[in-house]
């Protein structure tokens, strides 16, 4: 079965199309650029000159159809009936550039069928005035009609033309040129003259000031030839000579005559026709760009010597980090012939001997500290003449791998912050000596915990808490910007640059107290630091400073460091650790006692082993059957966070508000380290050090 194809065997019934009047609204779709015309293709618009306007006659049986082409604008403008018998069509025309940059090529109009030829119509400013949107102006569209069809048209509306000059694009090179030094001859173009009493708004301030826009609608106006203002030389493209006026046609609806000129298409896509006076124009000078909205303004060409490159964008405070992939540790050979067992103990720790040589460059002074990772010793550098701290890891493969990770972190920090503005420990040297990876750093004073312990666990002054916490938040925010999570923040890993202090005795206290002279700190111990995009172990952080999401098995990220800072601040304020426990259920019960109940949604998302810590009502299942009485009594004696900071002081109230934003169970809703730096607690001046 053959599919039926719709064919147009006869001309469309335009009388039936216009039986309800002219369409009230026109939707115009304009392409970004008109297609290039070729000599083999017909032009999308008419190329013959615009003749005198003749009001259309209503259709009747006594009026035969004309032999010329009929172009009917769908917006109700006048139809044009040029006759080939009275007017000779030109075989070619001067090429023009339209608004889209299309160069129509010369062609033979007579070679095309009569129904393909369109006739331009005059521009009507009140086109599409039947639209329900009074400020929507579109140029009239022209549809070709067969010669035998007589459209039904309304009386012609009041024609208007724009009152300003329309810019014309660059013509083809074969047109006659006029010297730039010679002032252009300005023709008499039709100018819009509106009675001031009937103008809805000042014409010089109306929004339709661009060359492709139109005057306001519904404005009765009168056409009359007038002289436009004189333009500066080489400003706009002007006609080389004036054109002879065509015969004017007197309309009954207009009080004066209308001068019709030749029409030049501005856009073939929209079929917009603008009245012009000459088919030839003078090209502009070289290197002069004339925008459509400012075609009458002189634009000075820019020379190469006047060019100035744009300013470079300022680098951000914390630029995107470049992670160090792997560190190649140089090996320092041992010159002695002793057995390696004489330097290490059974656990792989290095035996520290004061006044002994170390790595052929350093002299051991004393032991500073030790831990599961290894030992920290104070040495004298014979090359620089300064004391330094050397972290000597255990000669066990897993600790060696951990030290390589720490070296990667320290090198990443050093590359991102060479001036050490963010108070992190700086890497000075590293090497492999006797199967121990050694990390050399500057020598600092006590840790915050050591100073607190040496001060009989007396709380720090509020002013010092403000200074210490601000530096700590800044260091952690810097690490987070590098994609690093410290995971082991505690007072032991916060070093004082100098532990110099003074002892004071307050009259209302029975004991003396040490007060630091300087609160400058350095953040240390990056052995557990983890890049955000790398493997995360299930359990991190020291027990007292561990975040709840780690205990519940929900995974961890940057917020776990913020929780640890909150625990440090409470310890600086009270002198005691906030969560003194070593068991998960007791730890969760302490959080519930001090900070409030857990979120039911967070409990449901926790691991199956962690859900056994809670009852069906969402409370922590504690005490257990094997819980000692001492632990139960201690937990019952705990105070809430508001009771701990129940001091009538605005500074303490601000610190409490900051801690409430830190101790949020949901890590997504917890304040970040960068946001904490903007908290009012750090901008509040605290006068007294005590």
UniProtKB/Swiss-Prot annotation:
ATP binds at residues 368-376, 391. The active site is at 488 (proton acceptor). Keywords: ATP-binding, Kinase, Nucleotide-binding, Phosphoprotein, Serine/threonine-protein kinase, Transferase, Tyrosine-protein kinase. GO terms for molecular function: ATP binding; protein kinase activity; protein serine kinase activity; protein serine/threonine kinase activity; protein serine/threonine/tyrosine kinase activity; protein tyrosine kinase activity. Residues 39-70 are annotated as: Disordered. InterPro entries: CLK_kinases, Kinase-like_dom_sf, Prot_kinase_dom, Protein_kinase_ATP_BS, Ser/Thr_kinase_AS. Autophosphorylates on all three types of residues. One of its GO terms (cellular component) is nucleus. One of its GO terms (biological process) is negative regulation of G1/S transition of mitotic cell cycle. It comes from the Eukaryota. Residues 362-682 form the Protein kinase domain. Its EC number is 2.7.12.1. It catalyses: L-seryl-[protein] + ATP = O-phospho-L-seryl-[protein] + ADP + H(+); L-threonyl-[protein] + ATP = O-phospho-L-threonyl-[protein] + ADP + H(+); L-tyrosyl-[protein] + ATP = O-phospho-L-tyrosyl-[protein] + ADP + H(+). The keyword Ribonucleoprotein does not apply. It is an enzyme of class 2 (transferase). Belongs to the protein kinase superfamily. CMGC Ser/Thr protein kinase family. Lammer subfamily. PANTHER family: SERINE/THREONINE-PROTEIN KINASE DOA-RELATED, SERINE_THREONINE-PROTEIN KINASE DOA. Protein kinase that may act as a negative regulator of filamentous growth and flocculation. Appears to have a role in normal cell wall and septum formation and in cell separation. May have antagonistic function in the regulation of beta-glucan distribution between the sites for cell wall and septum assembly. This is Dual specificity protein kinase lkh1. It comes from Schizosaccharomyces pombe (strain 972 / ATCC 24843) (Fission yeast). The lineage of its organism: Eukaryota, Fungi, Dikarya, Ascomycota, Taphrinomycotina. The gene is lkh1.
């Amino acid at each position: 079965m053959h599919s039926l194809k719709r064919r147009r065997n006869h001309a469309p019934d335009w009388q039936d199309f216009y039986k309800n009047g002219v369409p009230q609204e026109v939707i115009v779709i304009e392409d970004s650029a008109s297609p290039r015309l070729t000599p083999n293709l017909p032009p999308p618009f008419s190329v013959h000159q615009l003749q005198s306007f003749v009001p259309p006659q209503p259709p009747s049986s006594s009026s035969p159809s004309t032999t010329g082409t009929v172009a009917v604008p769908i917006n109700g403008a006048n139809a044009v009936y040029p006759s080939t018998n009275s007017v000779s069509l030109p075989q070619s025309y001067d090429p023009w550039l339209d608004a889209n940059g299309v160069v129509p090529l010369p062609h033979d109009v007579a070679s095309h069928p009569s129904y393909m030829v369109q006739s331009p119509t005059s521009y009507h400013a009140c086109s599409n005035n039947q639209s329900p949107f009074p400020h929507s102006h579109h140029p009239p569209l022209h549809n070709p009609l067969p010669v035998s069809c007589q459209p039904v048209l309304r009386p012609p509306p009041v024609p208007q033309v724009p009152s300003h000059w329309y810019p014309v694009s660059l013509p083809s090179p074969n047109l006659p040129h006029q010297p730039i030094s010679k002032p252009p001859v300005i023709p008499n173009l039709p100018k819009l003259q509106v009675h001031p009493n009937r103008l809805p708004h000042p014409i010089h301030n109306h929004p339709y000031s661009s060359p492709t826009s139109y005057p306001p609608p519904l404005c009765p106006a009168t056409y009359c030839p007038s002289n436009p203002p004189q333009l500066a030389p080489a400003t706009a493209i002007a006609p080389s000579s004036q054109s002879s006026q065509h015969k004017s046609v007197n309309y009954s609806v207009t009080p004066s005559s209308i001068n019709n000129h030749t029409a030049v298409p501005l856009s073939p896509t929209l079929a917009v026709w603008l009245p012009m006076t000459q088919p030839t124009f003078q090209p502009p000078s070289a290197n002069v760009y004339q925008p459509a909205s400012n075609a009458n303004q002189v634009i000075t060409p820019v020379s190469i010597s006047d060019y100035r490159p744009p300013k470079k964008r300022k680098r951000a405070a914390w630029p995107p980090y470049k992670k160090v992939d792997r560190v190649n540790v140089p090996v320092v050979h041992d010159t002695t012939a002793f057995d390696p067992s004489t330097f290490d103990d059974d656990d792989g720790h290095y035996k520290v001997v004061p006044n002994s040589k170390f790595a052929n460059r350093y002299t051991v002074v004393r032991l500073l500290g030790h831990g599961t990772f290894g030992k920290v010793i104070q040495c004298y550098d014979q090359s620089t003449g300064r004391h330094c701290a050397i972290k000597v890891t255990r000669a066990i493969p897993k600790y060696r791998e951990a030290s390589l990770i720490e070296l990667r972190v320290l090198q990443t920090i050093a590359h991102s912050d060479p001036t050490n503005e963010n108070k992190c420990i700086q890497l000075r040297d590293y090497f492999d000596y006797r199967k121990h990876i050694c990390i050399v750093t500057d020598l600092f004073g006590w840790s915050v915990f050591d100073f607190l312990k040496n001060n009989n666990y007396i709380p720090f002054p509020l002013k010092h808490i403000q200074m210490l916490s601000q530096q700590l938040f800044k260091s952690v925010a810097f690490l987070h910007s590098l994609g690093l999570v410290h995971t082991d923040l505690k007072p032991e890993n916060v070093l004082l640059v100098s532990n110099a202090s003074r002892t004071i005795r307050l009259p209302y206290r029975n004991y003396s107290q040490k007060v630091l002279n300087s609160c400058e700190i350095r953040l240390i111990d990056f052995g557990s630091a983890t890049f955000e995009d790398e493997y995360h172990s299930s359990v991190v952080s020291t027990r007292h400073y561990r975040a709840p999401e780690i205990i519940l098995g929900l995974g961890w990220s940057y917020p776990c460091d913020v929780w640890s800072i909150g625990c440090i601040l409470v310890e600086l304020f009270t002198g005691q650790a906030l969560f003194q426990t070593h068991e998960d259920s007791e730890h969760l019960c302490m959080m519930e006692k001090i900070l409030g109940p857990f979120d039911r949604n967070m409990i449901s998302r926790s691991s199956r082993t962690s859900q056994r810590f809670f009852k069906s009502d969402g409370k922590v299942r504690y005490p257990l059957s094997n819980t000692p009485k001492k632990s139960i009594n201690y937990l019952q004696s705990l105070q809430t966070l508001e009771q701990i900071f129940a001091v009538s002081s605005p500074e303490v109230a601000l610190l409490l508000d900051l801690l409430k934003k830190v101790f949020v169970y949901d890590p997504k809703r917890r304040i970040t380290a960068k946001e904490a730096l903007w908290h009012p607690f750090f901008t509040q001046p605290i006068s007294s050090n005590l």
